[in-house]
Curated annotation (Swiss-Prot):
Name the UniProt record assigns to this protein: Cyclin-dependent kinase 14
Domain Protein kinase: 117-401
Task performed by this protein: Serine/threonine-protein kinase involved in the control of the eukaryotic cell cycle, whose activity is controlled by an associated cyclin. Acts as a cell-cycle regulator of Wnt signaling pathway during G2/M phase by mediating the phosphorylation of LRP6 at 'Ser-1490', leading to the activation of the Wnt signaling pathway. Acts as a regulator of cell cycle progression and cell proliferation via its interaction with CCDN3. Phosphorylates RB1 in vitro, however the relevance of such result remains to be confirmed in vivo.
Gene of this entry: CDK14
Family that this chain belongs to: Belongs to the protein kinase superfamily. CMGC Ser/Thr protein kinase family. CDC2/CDKX subfamily.
Domain of life: Eukaryota
Location within or outside the cell: Cell membrane; Cytoplasm; Nucleus
Catalytic activity: L-seryl-[protein] + ATP = O-phospho-L-seryl-[protein] + ADP + H(+); L-threonyl-[protein] + ATP = O-phospho-L-threonyl-[protein] + ADP + H(+)
Gene source species: Plecturocebus moloch (Dusky titi monkey)
Entry's EC annotation: 2.7.11.22
């Protein structure tokens, strides 16, 4: 259940974040690639002082149920999620997350209360959180309880505040749902919908590459979720198979928003210590701290190839240098002609890299040639120059998806793709339909179900 907590999600030293609704005018963006995406972000020095709100990892007087006092400043968003900043007696601002419990009798279990959930089993442990499978005493549903340990000296982990603040405002079938937030003196608990596995575990269970139809449905759902958050100017920043949850019916859900960032916030540079090395784009590996949604799209390309080929696209074994060499071996060593501006990146030293020519992707990953249009889509996602990468919205319109039912593009945000007739997963190699049980939606091939 790595997707619920993310072992590498500890906050970077000295890291600050800005939360809230964009206070800027957004221009129309290209739907073909990531070029021009950064133009919608105002530099920090152009934002009036009274519009700047900073959250730091400080000792917290965190109480999600306290009514706002007069000294509380509110940062609103269009979806009514908000983060409050209450000025303490020391003059520092400490983060507060507000939520409202539904009315109930004094003796019945309530949302927002620790005794409303029963822990069933431990699922895993990260650097600052432990995840349990649990059950709600309010409605009887299974949940995942992400229990974050609060350190008296450090206060509430910043990544937890970021994750909660973003997820409370995201409602989409392909994004893990945050049901509840519980705060006690010792812990902060995020209560998520329970999803039984992740893409990493799913691929480990089915080595050698997944069924092509299933790859297509998983990728479509990943792009749906990303398109939704990117349209809201949010970057995930930590895409990897462990952070993509898979339900027993085949629904894919983006999870672990601990490193996610609202890109509409007035900040041009972000930490480059994000994204597991295998899924980290070359611009970030080379020290770039100015990036946008194209950061996530590189990860999509890596995951796409891995689902088809059955092995990681760029499995670096040593360090950043080794990771870059593996990328350049396939895509070619960049220069100013193929990647304008690459020489200005902090860690790009041409003499350090072997000079490789680019090759067709099927030479590196032969199974791409077995699937119509897969190589073309992968090549448009795995572009060294970030501005050349396809956007999530454009990728959804790629010919690779042309044999899917048109109604998939008409679904509302909260509607699952499996509500469309004949859209269902296929048994993976060596599995029978019986192995999945009666609740799973396996059936005839997608190639025969366009409508």
């Amino acid at each position: 259940m790595h997707g619920y907590f993310g072992c590498n999600a500890a906050a970077e030293p000295g890291y600050s974040a800005f939360l809230g609704t964009p206070q800027i005018c957004v221009t129309k963006m290209s739907t073909r690639n990531c070029q021009g995406m950064d133009s919608v972000i105002k530099p920090l020095d152009t934002i009036p002082e009274d519009k700047k709100v900073r959250v730091q990892r400080t000792q917290s007087t965190f109480d999600p149920f306290e009514k706002p006092a007069n000294q509380v400043k509110r940062v609103h968003s269009e979806n009514n999620a908000c983060i409050n900043f209450k000025t303490s007696s020391t003059g520092k601002e400490s983060p507060k997350v507000r939520r409202h419990s539904s009315p109930s009798s004094p003796t019945s279990p309530k949302f927002g209360k620790a005794d409303s959930y029963e822990k069933l089993e431990k699922l895993g442990e990260g650097s600052y959180a432990t995840v349990y499978k649990g059950k709600s005493k309010v409605n009887g549903k299974l949940v995942a309880l992400k229990v974050i340990r609060l350190q008296e000296e450090e206060g509430t982990p910043f990544t937890a505040i970021r994750e909660a603040s973003l997820l409370k405002g995201l409602k989409h079938a392909n994004i893990v749902l945050l049901h509840d937030i519980i705060h006690t003196k010792e812990t902060l608990t995020l209560v998520f919908e329970y999803v039984h596995t992740d893409l990493c575990q799913y691929m480990d269970k089915h080595p050698g590459g997944l069924h092509p139809d299933n790859v297509k449905l998983f990728l479509f759902q990943l792009l749906r979720g990303l398109s939704y958050i990117h349209q809201r100017y949010i970057l995930h920043r930590d895409l990897k198979p462990q952070n993509l949850l898979i339900s027993d019916t085949g629904e894919l859900k983006l999870a672990d928003f601990g490193l996610a960032r609202a890109k509409s916030v007035p900040s041009h540079t972000y930490s480059n210590e994000v994204v597991t090395l295998w899924y980290r784009p070359p611009d970030v590996l080379l020290g770039s701290t100015e990036y946008s949604t194209c950061l996530d799209m590189w990860g999509v390309g890596c995951i796409f190839v891995e689902m088809i080929q059955g092995v990681a696209a760029f499995p670096g074994m040593k360090d950043i240098q080794d990771q870059l060499e593996r990328i350049f071996l396939v895509l070619g060593t960049p220069n100013e002609d193929t990647w304008p501006g690459v020489h200005s990146l902090p860690h790009f030293k041409p003499e350090r890299f072997t000079l490789y020519s680019s090759k067709n992707l099927r030479q590196a990953w032969n199974k791409l040639s077995y699937v119509n249009h897969a190589e073309d889509l992968a090549s448009k996602l795995l572009q060294c120059s970030p501005k050349n990468r396809l956007s999530a919205q454009a990728a959804l319109s790629h010919e690779y998806f042309s044999d899917l039912p048109p109604r998939l593009w008409e679904l509302t945000d909260m509607s699952s793709i499996f509500t469309i007739p004949n859209v269902r997963l296929q048994p993976e190699a060596g599995e029978s339909m019986r192995a999945f049980g009666k609740n799973n939606s396996y059936g005839k091939s997608l190639s025969n179900s366009k409508h």
